[in-house]
Regions:
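N-terminal intrinsically disordered, cationic/polar leader segments
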Residues: 2-112
Length: 112
């Protein structure tokens, strides 16, 4: 069930999600890529200069991701599964990012 989140809850949940992704990716492959979290915007830069950018979009209560593999995508929070689900399909933010990072780095990262 996807319902609009109360603003304070959204900010807390989105910030926590982005910070956790930053920590997990940095711990897993931070020696091979540049992971930077600043002002709530997560930038993952590959050696090629390509970037993944993940940030929250408060107006829509979504997390947005820009990926050099899958392009731009938006995610709503699904309370039933406690995950950020794509507005374009059944994929979660964690699944899409893990798949895209595997394509670009050859490393499979468990983000869930």
């Amino acid at each position: 069930l996807i319902v609009p989140l109360e603003e304070t809850f959204f900010h807390r949940l989105a910030d926590q999600t982005i910070e956790t992704i930053s920590d997990v990716v940095d711990d897993a492959i931070g020696d091979k890529i540049d992971v930077d979290l600043e002002a709530g915007i997560l930038t993952i830069e590959l050696d090629s200069g390509e970037q993944f950018i993940i940030n929250k979009h408060a107006l829509n209560r979504q997390i947005w991701m820009s990926s050099p593999v899958s392009g731009a995508s938006h995610y709503d929070y699904d309370e039933d599964t406690e995950s950020w689900r794509s507005t374009r399909g059944a994929t979660t933010l964690h699944e899409q990012l893990a798949a895209d990072l595997a394509v670009k780095t050859g490393h499979k990262i468990a983000l869930d």
